[in-house]
């Protein structure tokens, strides 16, 4: 299995994301997120991925939230927003999503995730808790505490 790599913010990353736009789910494209990060060149990239050879096959964004999320994490000063975890169709069910998720958990911070595209059961199997509420787009919100 590939190693989780920190993706740089540049036009090469935009090219790597092309397969996800072609084959992935429209809700997970990350076009605006990447463009916004490229404009602010001083920011650290929130993007991580797994390669098979030279091909990016799985990706996610981890956004470090430096404010208290009192609704879900009343005892924490910081948490991570796991944003748009996605694996290309032909590479699914090979453990890449779990590998990315375990990488996020290594930060030892609470994680808030939005379950898109029938991913709720996956998150529950990985130890996330359903807070039984939805985000403004109607997707389930799940949390994980270290």
Curated annotation (Swiss-Prot):
Transmembrane portions of the chain: none
EC number: 2.3.1.-
MF GO annotations: acyltransferase activity, transferring groups other than amino-acyl groups
Keyword list, A-Z: Acyltransferase, Transferase
Disulphide bonds in the chain: none
Xref: CDD domains: NAT_SF
Residues of the N-acetyltransferase domain: 7-146
HAMAP family: Acetyltransf_YlbP
Name under which the protein is recorded: Uncharacterized N-acetyltransferase SE_0851
Species of the source: Staphylococcus epidermidis (strain ATCC 12228 / FDA PCI 1200)
